Each structure stands twice: as C-alpha cells, then as structure tokens.
Amino acid sequence: MIQTLTDLSALRALVNGWKREGLRVALVPTMGNLHVGHYSLVMLARQYADRVVSSVFVNPTQFGPNEDFACYPRTPEADLRGLEDAGCDALWLPDVDTMYPLGTALATPIHAPGVSDVLEGECRPGHFDGVCTVVARLFNQVQPDVAAFGKKDYQQLAVIRQMVADLAFPIEILGGSIVREADGLAMSSRNQYLSAEERPISANIHKVLLQMRDSYAVGTPRAQVEDAASHALEQAGFRVDYAVVRLPDLSEPGDGHTGAHVALIAARLGSTRLIDNLEF
C-alpha cells in the first residue's frame, strides 16, 4: 500500500531505511492532476529502482503573472489511487512552508543559463528558474538515485539535465516518452481547459509536427518549414508562440539536415496554452 507523507523528517526516515537495505530509490516529481502520462513515468522509474516516490506540489515560483496557478487543477484523491495502481511506493506532499521555509521571496534561485533562456524561457520569463529551484529542493529532500521526467516538456528535461550535470547531483535522469490521445494530442493536465469545440482542433499540433518532420527530412529550408507550420496552426485557430526545428540541445541547426533534430511547438487555443514536440 502506498504511503503518504507530509513531514520531511518522516520522508527522510523512510528513504534512509530503504537505502540501508541497499535499495535504489526513484523520484517522479509532479504538480498533480495526474494522467496516464504521469503514471507511465512511475512505471519507467520502477524499471530503474526498487522503490518509487512521487511528489505532488503545485509550485508557485514557476508560474508567471496572469498564469493559472490559482486555478491549476487539483485532484488529490484520484492522484493517490492512480499512483498506487501504477506501483508507486510513497507520495510526498510538501506544503509551501516546507518547500520554501524562508518564503518564496527569499528562496535561493537556480538559473540554468543558455538552455533555459530560449523558447519557453522567452515566452515565460523566470519559469525555468522556478522549475530548477523546486526540483533541486525535491532532490535534496528525497535524495533519489534516479528521477523521471516526461519528454512532453522537452525543454524542461534539457534544463534539468544541465542543472544536474553542473551541480553534480548524483542522480540519473530518465526521459519518459510522450503519451498521446488516440488523435495524437499529447496528454497534459491542461487539456481539460479545452472546450468541446476546441478539443478536436487541438490535435492539429501533432499533425503539424509530423508535417514539419517530413518537410525538413526532404531538405526543405528550416525557415520555410517553420513558417509553414506557424501558418497551418494559425489557419486552424491557434495563436502561435513558436514552431521551430532545433538540435537536441535546442541550438539552431546549420544548413545540414542530417542527424538528430526536434520540432517544438507552443501555441494557444482559446485560453489554453499547449506545448508539444517530436524528435526525429
């Protein structure tokens, strides 16, 4: 049966007990309102560890002004049931005072230069500082051997990998594959913001990503690929933040079209901001 913990000393006692037994511990950080994509991360983590801790904490420092912190969906009972079914051993539920004992205004920030300053970093200034700050705190609280993050937040995963390497966290970072609905929409906690009319339109993001991949693969210039993608999304009713092709480290590719690339999209449909990506 899954254990639920709200006290840091109890969490550390549990994890330390596991480690004394020689068990590997994994962490799956979340903000709750969990779906199949989150549960797939628990199952991925289980392949690399003997015990899995998932955290649920809606982190105020990664939300910008006029974003959805206050109304971010919270579904604690369903989350607990789903985590238990997925094989999670412990649920860590810190409150704001535990996570930020000096208050958010005095929290020591962590910034990952370069990778956190482009794309989402330009659209949501300070977002990744909040992500790095809370993830580093979760790492210190749980002391995991392994941590799993979803590839849907491709840039977030890259930012966390950079932070872990630079700050020498002794933690293996796993990237979990994107889990999609039948029509291709990437699963996201924010999908429930979509209206009944918007929901079928939202699947166009994945269709456009596939078009970007196929067009780029036959040698279409990158600028032309990106312009066509933005136009297709706008025609479908989106307001586009970006639709780009990048190298895996999120730098801009040169003239060659060989090697690994990733197409990334962020766009708004009504009041809902959606992000997705496709590696190729």
From Swiss-Prot:
Matches recorded under CDD domains: PanC (cd00560)
What does UniProt list as catalytic?
A: H38 (proton donor)
For the biological process aspect of GO, one term held by this record is: pantothenate biosynthetic process
What sections of the protein cross the membrane?
none
Q: From the Swiss-Prot or TrEMBL record, state where the protein is found.
A: Cytoplasm
Q: Which GO terms describe its cellular component?
A: cytosol
Query: Per its record, what are the GO molecular function terms?
Result: ATP binding; pantoate-beta-alanine ligase activity
Q: Does the keyword Transferase apply?
A: no
The positions annotated for binding ATP are 31-38, 150-153, 179, 187-190
State the EC number(s): 6.3.2.1
Q: Which UniProt keywords apply?
A: ATP-binding, Cytoplasm, Ligase, Nucleotide-binding, Pantothenate biosynthesis
Q: What is its main location?
A: cytoplasm
Give the matching Pfam families. Answer: Pantoate_ligase (PF02569)
**Pathway entry:** Cofactor biosynthesis; (R)-pantothenate biosynthesis; (R)-pantothenate from (R)-pantoate and beta-alanine: step 1/1
NCBIfam families in alphabetical order: panC (TIGR00018)
Q: What does this protein do?
A: Catalyzes the condensation of pantoate with beta-alanine in an ATP-dependent reaction via a pantoyl-adenylate intermediate.
Q: Which family does it belong to?
A: Belongs to the pantothenate synthetase family.
The protein's name: Pantothenate synthetase
Task: Please tell me the species this chain comes from.
Answer: Xanthomonas oryzae pv. oryzae (strain KACC10331 / KXO85)
